[in-house]
Amino acid sequence: MIRPALELDAVGLQIGGARILRDVSMQVATGEMVGVIGPNGAGKTTLFNIISGVAVPTSGRVLLAGDDVTGRRVHQRARAGLGRTFQTSSVFPGLTVAENARLAAQSKLGGATSPWRFPRADDDAHGVAMRCLEEVGLAHHAGTAAGVLSHGDKRKLEIAMLLATEPEVVLLDEPMAGVGSGDVAGLVEVIRRLHASGRTVLMVEHHMEVLLGLVERVAVMHHGELLAIDAPKAVMADPAVQKAYLGETV
C-alpha cells in the first residue's frame, strides 16, 4: 500500500477555551495538488502552521510519508522534505536574487544560517540557486536586488528559494496575494511546473479561478473544521459548501 505524502489525523488546536481547529483529517497522495479554501478565520493558515511546525496541535498527528512529525520543529520538517511559502514576502530585499536563492540552498546543504555570513564561493549552493532561478524564469535577474522586483517576481523568487531546499511536499499560502494581473499567468505557469515535477502541493488561495484551474481536489475549511474535500466541481456544487463559503442556500 502506497503511503500518503501527507496525512492529518484528527488534528485539533485549542487556545484557552477557544477551539481553533476541530479534528481535521485528510490524506494527500504523492504528486497530488489540493486547494484549501474557506472564509477568513476558517483555519486555513492555522492548518498550514501546524503542518509546517510553526504551531503545535493540542490533539492529533501530522505525518509525512507515514512518518509522525507532530513533535518536530520547523527545520526538522524541512529536512524531512516539507517546504512552505507565506502570505507575506519572505525575501531579503537587500540581497540579490541569486543570493536569496543561494541562502536557501545552503540551508539544505548545511551551510551558514545568516544571510550576512554565507560563503560567497560556495559553488554547490550557487549551482543549485541558479538552476532553481532558471526553473522559475528569474535567472536573468540573478544580480538584481530582490527588493526592486515586482510582487509577482518576488513570489517566483520565493518558489525558487523553496525549490532550493528540495522539498517533496509544498505548502503555498496565498501565492497570488498582491500580485498584479499582468503577473498572474506567469506565476500560474511556475506553479504548474512545480506540480508537474512530481511534488505534492497544498495551496491556500482566494483567487478562485486560478485555484480551480490548478488543483485536483479542494478542501473546504469552515469554523476550524474540514467541511468537505472532493473534486472541484463536486465541492462547488455541494449545498453545504455554498451555504458556508458563499453564504447562499440552494
Give the positions of each predicted feature.
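Glycine-rich phosphate-binding loops of nucleotide-dependent enzymes
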Residues: 2-250
